[in-house]
Structure formats: structure tokens, C-alpha cells
Amino acid sequence: MAFQWPRFPLQPWRHVTGHLRLPGDKSISNRSLLLGALAEGVTEVTGLLDSDDARAMLNALRDLGVVIEGPHQGRCTVHGVGLHGLKAPPGPLFLGNAGTAMRPLSAALALQPFDTTLTGDPRMSERPINRLVDALREMGAVIEYLAQEGYPPLTIRGGGSVSSQFLTALLMTAPMASAQIKSGLLLSKPYIDITLNVMPFGVPTRDHTERIFAVSAIRYPSPAVLRLEGDATSASYFLAAAGIKGVPVTGIGRHSMQGDSWFPRALRRMGARSCGSSMIVCPRGELRAAVRSDSNSIPDAAMTLATXXALARGGRRPRTIFAWRVKETDRLYAMSTELGAAGARVVPGAGLRGCPLRGRSYYVARCRRDSRMAMCFSLPAHGGRAVRHPGSRLHRQDAELSSKVVRSVPEVWGMAITALRCPSGGALRAMARFESMTGQRGDVVSQLPLLGAARRHAGTFGG
């Protein structure tokens, strides 16, 4: 009997009250775990994100001989082994689709005295890693591709123009190299800033320009305690929901190191109002379109911006979002396709122009095993459209792939049920339980946030 994907009806919200404390950022979480492992001493990390990416990094570090206590309620203790204290793993390290684990680990393992094979799920094998590998090879590392040239999986035997993780990996492993590392042509500079700011481990860095960084060779002393700031990308979904009025969203201040913390300014241009030192947005009416923007520095929040623009009056065009093509899915194609299916007018090209959704009261959105897609396409329910997320099952080629979608912010369920007093708590609990159950073909239903239930309209979600 074929596996039946359930639907989860969410009731509309007329009043929303509560206080949100954001979970940690995915990129900062994994950078901090790796730096803690390579440090000398014990590092207590607080504010850690509970996600598939973080679990991939934690499992890999444990296989490499690092003792880690937790995580428990966003807190874990990492017993650092030093730059050369990692041990040969018992087998290949499977990292799923966690680019924030694959690239930094590739660099950190390049000068270890043992061979390591890094593998991932099918999507990982489509995400290029050749720039990092080329840079490491120039520094003397011996790395072999096991399948397609330039892509994982790879065996390590011992910059950042497409994805910031390329330079991130080099920045992290720089102390193990004999020379300073320089890289240019950055497309995601805010993510580079994250790495530079997550170095209270005693590593001096200099940001000469937006094109050149230099990191001096030195050891990593542990900072003892490392508190991670909240995830600005996760905040963007709540901030974009017109039905969530005056709900404080804390964990990210005005001086956040994350590029996506720019998102409230974009919303102000569209008619929202922010106040206070934390990210609090109080919509003062229907969102309206704003001027064009270069969204390359906020590739994740740009997805939320594009979806919100499709619900606004007029059109908006987030431009130069090149990094979308090499994320968890080809997000440029996915966003264009799904916005078009929802009734928006999509202009082909490197940019994306969203126009108000029209003419449909119900539509299906494919999340393509990408949690960011699932989060974004819950927003159209604010416009009176019931949305059903089919996960991967509608297309045979997708159904044959075994891959989890629930990767980034599972804490959103706790926010919806507890912090915001969600009237659809029962449905969300059922959905959260379903997320942990593997379907017949190994697929897991996509993570769907509370946003579809906001304001006057209900969203119906399902596998």
C-alpha cells in the first residue's frame, strides 16, 4: 500500500501575543563547534541551533575523537584536542546536505596525518567544492574526487566566489598553514564577517578590504564560554508575517554580525516599522513594493523578501542572488517556479521580480527538500490562499531520493505552540511528530512553520 502523506490544517490567528527568543544561527553554530574542537581547552557553547547541519558536524567531530557533552537545550561542551589532535575516523564521514560542515571539515582535515573520506546525500554531490579543493591543493594538500570532478564525495589525504563557506574553511584552518591566506571576489561577505567575528579563540585577523582577508598563523586558545547570537534568517519569516504584530523577536541586535539582520530595513521600505534595539516589527498596513536591491549579501533572507514582495502591492526585484544556484537546491529555479505556480509574474534572469499573487485560492508548493523553501511558501497563506507542501513525493526522481528536509529550525514548533500561544498547537505537534518518522521511500515531510496560520486565513499543509 502506498504511503499516505497527511495534511495538517492550521486555524487562523486573530490575535498573536508572546515573546520569541530565536535559536542560534546555523553557520555560526557549526563554525563554533569546529573551532572549539580545534582549540586547546574546553569550550562551552550556548545558543546552539538544533538542526541536521549541527548534528552532522557533531557526529563527524565525535568520529574524529572529539569529546562533546550535549547538546542539551542549546548548550554543549566541547573538549578541544588542538590543531593536530584529531583521530582517524572509523569510516567515511556522512554529512548529509550540510555544506556548513563539508567545507570547513575539508580544510581542517587537509593537514591531518590520516586519510578521511567525506560523503553526503545526493544533493551534496551537486554542490561544487572545486574552489576550496584547488586552494587546499595549492597549499600542499592531497585531495581526490571519488565521483564527479569538482564535487563531493572526496577523500582527503594529507576563494569564496560562489559560497562563503569556501573562504570560511580557509579562515578556520589558516593557523595550520605555514603562510597567510588571501582570497578575493567575495559574493557573501556577511558570512565571511561571521567567521571573523566568531574568532574569540585568539586568532588575529585583518579585513583589509571587501576583497582581501589575511589570517595570521597561530594556535586556537579556547575562550571558555561562547554565546551564539540568534538566527537572523529564521527571524525573517516571523518578521515578514503581517499577522504577527508587535511580537518581540530577540537574540539579534542592531550590531549583529549576520548579513540577514539587514532584513528589517528591507521591511521598513515595504511599510513595516521597527523599534527598539532588538528586532521588533509592527506592520502598519498592507506591505507595499520597494525599490530594487542587491540581495547577494543576504541569500537566505532574500527568499523571504521575494515571497513577501509577491504578496505586496507592486513589484520588487531582488537582484544578483547568484549563490541561490548552489544552495540546498537550485533556489533561483525553485523560487521562480513556485512563485509562478502560485500566480506571481516571474521575470527570468539572475534577478527575480515578484508581483502580487493572483487568481488562486489554493495551490501546491514543492519545497524540494529545502527547509527555507518550506518556510517561505507558508507566507502566501496570509493572502487568503491555502498552501499544501507536498515535500518530494510529486515527482518520481525526487521520491527516489532519501533526504531529510527538516534541517534548520525545528525550534519553530516550540515558538508556535508555547511562546505565541498558537491555536493550532495540536496540528503543529502532530506535524512535528510526523517529521521524525521516515516515509516508505525514506523521505521526511518538509518542515512547515506557523506563519500560514496567521491573521484571518488558514493554511492547510501536508506531505
From Swiss-Prot:
Active-site positions on this chain: 300
Residues recorded as binding 3-phosphoshikimate, renumbered to this chain, are 26-27, 31, 163-165, 188, 300, 327
Q: What is its main location?
A: cytoplasm
Q: Does the keyword Lipid metabolism apply?
A: no
In its keyword annotation, does this UniProt entry include Amino-acid biosynthesis? yes
Family statement drawn from the similarity comment of this UniProt entry = Belongs to the EPSP synthase family.
- What's the protein name? 3-phosphoshikimate 1-carboxyvinyltransferase
Q: What is the lineage of its organism?
A: Bacteria, Pseudomonadati, Pseudomonadota, Betaproteobacteria, Burkholderiales
